[in-house]
Amino acid sequence: MLIYYIISLIIVGIDQLTKYLTVQNIPLHETLEVIPSVLSFTYHQNTGAAWSILEGQMIFFYIVTLIVVGVIIYYMHTQGKNDKFFAFSLSLILGGAIGNFIDRLFLQYVVDMIRVEFIDFPIFNVADMSLTVGVALMLIYLFFDEWKEYRQKKVGTK
């Protein structure tokens, strides 16, 4: 179980390091091109969630994040100890949630910097990537878990 908390901690560390480097090296709203027309870093301060929804609702984000962290820890110890894939997806979600929570708590906004140039997509950060991949893996897990359960019931009814 400890390994999954270590994974979360590594994600938080990488997230906070990239945010620190962004703030120290890129002026607010300025862009540093990495791969022209593909990838750049743009320092952005987001007071909301994805696409800046719920902008300025910090108390709401504090409460939701604390609930999510509590639920993740609960499931990590109840379900995660029996399934590594499930625990890994939870560790990604936990790391991402804590990474953005730290920003909201101390800065009142989230530092975003990664910009994909070839599509119209919001600027994001390492915590956002971790959350997204964790949720995607969780959905895959839930789909296959339900499928397995369905197949077992189907075989059991014959």
Annotated model-derived regions:
Residues 1-158:
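Alpha-helical transmembrane bundles and membrane-interface segments of multipass inner-membrane proteins
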